[in-house]
From Swiss-Prot:
SUPFAM superfamilies: FAD/NAD(P)-binding domain
Positions annotated to bind FAD: 15-20, 127, 182, 371
Name of the protein: tRNA uridine 5-carboxymethylaminomethyl modification enzyme MnmG
Species this protein is from: Listeria monocytogenes serotype 4b (strain F2365)
Keyword field: Cytoplasm, FAD, Flavoprotein, NAD, tRNA processing
Entry-linked HAMAP family: MnmG_GidA
Primary subcellular site in the record, as a coarse category: cytoplasm
InterPro entries to which the protein is assigned, alphabetical: FAD/NAD-bd_sf, GIDA_C_N, MnmG, MnmG-rel, MnmG-rel_CS, MnmG_C, MnmG_C_subdom, MnmG_C_subdom_sf
Length: 632
């Protein structure tokens, strides 16, 4: 095919899903002339699976994206149909915000946001190859012969990469939701020497709302006073839609058991590795055969559609089996299935081939982000996309990449896990993966990351001023409570007795009283009058910082210890083969991962403490030899 020069840009983003839109917006807003290419303009920021954003760990990521200047939180706040705070009865480290999005409004709002950005060109096109010169990515070539040149390229092709849809015995080449797949780009990446692996994900059937008997299900309403994902959101949408809870039963399970031989999960048809933490209903029935039932949530896909997402029933069983098992579930006895559930297999680039900046080690100037890196979930994709877009733009401007630490953000945990440990299955972010999760809370994402967002140019001066005002208000209120003494008056003693707290023998500082588990900030406010208005957000932050001060200090000490290891950098071009005493597995892993610091090396699977000690001695001896040489 004849090719032609279609234009020159600073950054090209291939794909416009949740990773792609964040990458493109970050790059464009940082001043880089950005081209976004997508197979179908009608699918920008589309939600091919569940119509929700947030949840445990993921909701914190959305807050982090917002604090850094990304768009997912703002867009969700504009388009949600339900908002709920999860785990409110537990500690602050595991609380999480989750929204049901209107999936159609979400994608339309995001597309329009991109279209309004002056530095972004949004264009429909299918990328087949990259332009590579001397190991450096210089642009892309589309299937129509258009050559677009750029200084950096970000690939965010998601499950479109050589995608194949599977429903029972039916298997065909396709992207999600029966879209055109991207085949030749995967083949080209293999030609370049990238290691790809087949992964799998799935989605449940969609059913018609008017054919559901909701009287047989349990209503799951949104919060009466919904919280926002974005620091910028002032007014919340109060017109919410409920979700509904029902359950599978023994009849459902019998139908599934009788048809396991037709499920790609249990036949040679399935080649890809599925997500451990998002199993299909077939997988759940087999793995948890002792369970008499499984939860099913009925989630509306939007305000102006009859389609309902059957959360918990992800499946790739044949169409007629799906219809049969749906009708065994209470409330769904007469349900009409509008879309069949399916599994999709796709190519993933093994992420240990990336630097922590998400630039590939094999090709300079080429970045990858999202499900192509082996992750699952919109939020994980968006977080990676944001960081890849930031670093692609910073490379154009000859600036150092932004790399978030494991103590700074869940996004930092996610990327470090991927590039340091790799993944054998679709990676899902969990609170248990973060060793400093008390520091990485949903409520303090802005306090952790707004400074960085402002420094790199994604947070406006006006928003930064509002952030500083909030920060000052928190410190002022903490200081007030640390100085204010509460006397054991009859009124105070009566209140303490009423809530089951021990009476005061002497006066006590308000901050010390707040440290009692049963005492809330609201109770303190009833006793100690305030001269200035304190918002709910500031009150929450003051309470958490005072109540958990001891635990937070312990976590900070652990972080300082880790940072000392992070500061011990491994020299570039180190010859691991020259280090005697390293275990064979450690030698192989160190050569493959090429860790940047001793801390990162210590997190590599297969590298044990003895190997780290040998590596430290080798590096220190090298420094001594270098100093001796300089003195001579």
């Amino acid at each position: 095919m004849q090719t032609y020069n279609a234009g020159t840009f600073d950054v090209i983003v291939v794909g416009a899903g949740h990773a792609g839109v964040e990458a493109g917006l970050a790059s464009g807003r940082m001043g880089a002339k950005t081209l976004m290419l997508t197979i179908n303009l009608d699918m920008v920021a589309f939600m091919p699976c569940n119509p929700s954003v947030g949840g445990p760990a993921k909701g914190v990521v959305v807050r982090e994206i917002d604090a850094l200047g990304g768009e997912m939180g703002r867009n969700t706040d504009k388009t949600y149909i339900q908002m709920r705070m999860l785990n409110t009865g537990k500690g602050p480290a595991v609380r999480a915000l989750r929204a049901q999005a209107d999936k159609w409004d979400y994608q339309h709002e995001m597309k329009h946001t991109i279209e309004k950005e002056e530095n972004i060109t949004l264009r429909q096109g299918l990328v087949d190859r990259l332009v590579i010169e001397d190991g450096v990515c210089k642009g892309v070539i589309t299937n129509s012969g258009a050559i677009y040149y750029a200084k950096t390229v970000v690939i965010t092709t998601g499950t479109f990469s050589r995608g194949e849809i599977i429903v029972g015995e039916l298997r065909y080449s396709s992207g999600p939701n029966n879209q055109q797949p991207s085949v030749k780009l995967s083949e080209h990446l293999e030609e370049l020497g990238f290691e790809l692996r087949r992964f799998k994900t799935g989605t449940p059937p969609r059913v018609k709302s008017s054919t559901i008997d909701y009287s047989k299900t349990e209503e799951q309403p949104g919060d009466d006073h919904p919280r926002a994902f974005s620091f910028d959101t002032v007014e919340m949408l109060l017109d919410q839609l409920p979700c509904w809870l029902t359950y599978t039963n023994e009849t459902t399970h019998e139908i599934i058991q009788a048809n396991l031989h037709r499920s790609p999960m249990f036949t040679a048809t399935k080649k890809g590795t599925g997500a451990r933490y998002c199993p299909s209903i077939e997988d759940k029935i087999v793995r948890f055969s002792d369970k008499p039932r499984h939860q099913i949530f009925l989630e509306p896909e939007g305000k102006n559609t009859e389609e309902v997402y059957v959360q918990g029933l992800s499946t790739s069983l044949p169409e007629e089996v799906q219809r049969e098992m749906l009708r065994t579930i209470p409330g769904l006895e007469n349900v009409e299935m509008m879309r069949v559930g399916y599994a999709i297999e796709y190519d993933a680039v093994m992420p240990d081939q990336l630097w922590p900046s998400l630039e590939t080690k094999l090709v300079e100037g080429l970045f990858t982000a999202g499900q192509i890196n082996g992750t699952s979930g919109y939020e994980e994709a968006a977080g990676q996309g944001l960081m890849a877009g930031i670093n692609a733009a910073r490379k154009v401007f000859a600036k150092e990449p932004v790399i978030l630490g494991r103590d700074q953000a869940y996004i930092g945990v996610l990327i470090d896990d991927l590039v340091t440990k790799g993944t054998e299955e679709p990676y899902r972010l969990l609170t248990s993966r973060a060793e400093y999760r008390l520091l990485l809370r949903h409520d303090n994402a802005d306090l952790r990351l707004t400074e960085i967002g402002h420094e790199i140019g994604l947070i406006s001066d006006e928003r930064y001023e509002r952030f500083l005002a909030k920060q000052s208000a928190i410190e002022a209120e903490k200081e007030r409570l640390q100085k204010t003494r509460i006397k054991p008056t009859a009124e105070v003693q009566a209140m303490l007795k009423e809530i089951g707290s021990g009476e005061l023998k002497d006066g006590i500082l308000a901050a010390d009283l707040l440290r009692r588990p049963e005492i809330t900030y609201d109770k303190i406010a009833q006793i100690v009058s305030r001269e200035t208005f304190v918002t709910d957000e500031i009150a929450e932050q003051v309470e958490i910082q005072i109540k958990y001060e001891g635990y937070i200090q312990k976590s900070n000490l652990q972080v300082e210890k880790m940072k000392r290891m992070e500061d011990k950098k491994i020299p570039e071009n180190i010859d691991y083969d020259a280090i005697s005493g390293l275990a064979t597995e450690a030698l192989e892993k160190l050569k493959k991962i090429e860790p940047l610091s001793i801390a990162q090396a210590s997190r590599i699977s297969g590298v044990n403490p003895a190997d780290i000690s040998i590596l430290l001695v080798y590096i220190e001896q090298g420094k001594i030899a270098k100093r001796d040489k300089e003195k001579a």
